Curated annotation (Swiss-Prot):
Gene3D superfamilies with a match to the protein in the record: Spore Coat Polysaccharide Biosynthesis Protein SpsA, Chain A
Superkingdom as given in the UniProt entry: Bacteria
Organism expressing this protein natively: Clostridium botulinum (strain 657 / Type Ba4)
Its EC number(s): 2.7.7.60
Taxonomic placement: Bacteria, Bacillati, Bacillota, Clostridia, Eubacteriales
UniProt similarity note: Belongs to the IspD/TarI cytidylyltransferase family. IspD subfamily.
Broad class of enzyme this protein falls into: transferase
Pfam family, one: IspD
Keywords (A to Z) from UniProt: Isoprene biosynthesis, Nucleotidyltransferase, Transferase
NCBIfam families documented for this protein: ispD, PRK00155.1-3
Described purpose of this protein according to its UniProt entry: Catalyzes the formation of 4-diphosphocytidyl-2-C-methyl-D-erythritol from CTP and 2-C-methyl-D-erythritol 4-phosphate (MEP).
GN (gene name): ispD
Name of the protein this chain belongs to: 2-C-methyl-D-erythritol 4-phosphate cytidylyltransferase
Length: 229
């Protein structure tokens, strides 16, 4: 029977947080951010397994969090790579052999909703690849190399991509292997497909589905959690 798998990428060092602790281990309401992220997927009925990608020296810390909070469905914890795309590739190689749909999600994005997860799976079955996100609230400018504004795109044409980014497993694995062969660099997994002419359907995420990257995000995260509980 085919499975829906999720790869949680927790191999970042969080330099922008100005903390010696990796952002996924910082706490909100006395629980680590990683707990909230793992728990959301482990309690979702459509998710069959979780592969957690972590810094090699943090694998034991991750294992302790999983045990402490009785997180189910984590099948493996694997070490990350030099770049995010290398970490994702390690995760892709570790999922179950009968995985059909794979969701790739940031560990530091703990407020993903059940609907976002479910819709991602549904759109993959329909289109082969999908990513959630939001239309920017602010006006966005394009500037030249000297720092002067040269254009103002229509906000309705712009999309701030979030995670999970969701794919047919064979498609994303094939594109990642081509990426390694061609030694290309990307900043997210939708770009992996774009490099090889594949389309990604963009669907509605949530303005609350933030990635906790800076100290200000921690404060906002506490406010979001209070509204959700």
């Amino acid at each position: 029977m085919s499975k829906n798998s999720v790869i949680i990428v927790a191999a970042g060092k969080g330099k922008r947080m100005n903390s010696s602790i990796s952002k996924q281990f910082l706490q909100i309401k006395n629980k680590p951010i990683l707990y909230y992220t793992l728990n959301k997927f482990s309690t979702h009925e459509s998710i069959d397994e979780i592969v957690l990608v972590a810094l090699e020296d943090k694998i034991e810390v991750c294992s302790d969090i999983i045990d402490k909070y009785n997180i189910n469905k984590v099948s493996k914890i694997v070490p990350g790579g030099k770049e995010r795309q290398d970490s994702v590739y390690n995760g892709l190689k570790a999922v179950s052999k009968d995985c059909e749909v794979v969701l790739i999600h940031d560990a530091a994005r703990p407020f993903v909703t059940s609907d976002i997860i479910e819709n991602g799976i549904r759109y993959v079955n329909q289109y082969g690849a999908a990513a959630c996100g939001v239309i920017p609230k602010d006006t966005v400018k394009i500037k030249d190399e000297k720092g002067f504004a040269i254009d103002t795109p229509n906000r309705e044409d712009l999309f701030i991509v979030q995670t999970p980014q969701c794919f047919n497993y064979n498609i994303i694995l094939d594109c990642h292997e081509k990426l390694k062969k061609h030694n290309k660099k990307v900043t997210d997994d939708t770009m992996v497909l774009e490099n090889y002419g594949k389309s990604v359907y963009l669907y509605e995420g949530s303005y609350s589905n933030i990635k906790i990257t800076t100290p200000e995000d921690l404060i906002l995260g506490e406010q979001i959690l209070e509204k959700l509980t």
